[in-house]
């Protein structure tokens, strides 16, 4: 298997994917949504950056963002003119440390659907991050959200980590043990300890 990251960062609206995305469907249905990320440090884990319609919204926002330069904080006033802009804007200008997310919870402004895109340090990608750092980030998200049960019960939370590599497909998935018809226990990995030893993070 291979990965082609041709549209993993913001570029010109002359190129990119074109099919209708979930945020567009939510927008059309009148469901509030927002993508919380730090730009430029989202570790290119926001696939919407590769779609022409979001690239166009970025170009027409008056505050275009990119993966290669400091970006202005998201301005909610832009939403009236370019509602797709909040999918690629710098909505967590604090470096991705959840300040805006926590503020939106405290002020009752958390949308019905929230995506969180972790910055590089918490992406769980081998080298800049680890499962421990990703778990801490997820814990902080959930703590912030569950501090307010009224908000918690009225939102969908989606967390984006490092797109399609990193630890999740390099460590054998856990398997629930089960017994066969002879009572023998099954469910462990078929790889030897030596074969998987380099996959563990110390």
Q: What role is predicted for each listed range?
A:
Residues 1-202:
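N-terminal pro-sequences and low-complexity stem/linker regions of secreted or lumenal proteins
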């Amino acid at each position: 298997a291979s990965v082609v990251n041709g549209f993993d960062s913001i570029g010109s609206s002359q190129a990119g994917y074109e099919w209708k995305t979930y945020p567009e469907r939510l927008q059309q249905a009148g469901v509030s949504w927002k993508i919380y990320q730090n730009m430029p440090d989202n570790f290119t884990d926001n696939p919407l950056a590769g779609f022409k319609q979001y690239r166009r919204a970025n170009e027409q926002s008056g505050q275009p963002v990119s993966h290669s330069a400091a970006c202005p904080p998201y301005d909610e006033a832009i939403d009236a003119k370019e509602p797709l802009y909040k999918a690629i804007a710098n909505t967590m200008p604090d470096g991705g440390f959840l300040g805006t997310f926590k503020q939106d919870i405290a002020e009752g402004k958390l949308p019905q659907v929230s995506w969180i895109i972790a910055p590089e340090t918490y992406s769980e990608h081998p080298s800049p991050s680890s499962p421990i750092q990703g778990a801490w980030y997820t814990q902080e998200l959930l703590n912030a959200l569950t501090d307010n049960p009224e908000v918690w019960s009225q939102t969908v939370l989606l967390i984006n980590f490092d797109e399609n590599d990193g630890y999740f497909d390099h460590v054998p998935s856990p398997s629930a043990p089960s017994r066969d018809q002879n009572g023998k226990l099954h469910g462990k990995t078929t790889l030897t300890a030596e074969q998987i030893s380099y996959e563990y993070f110390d």
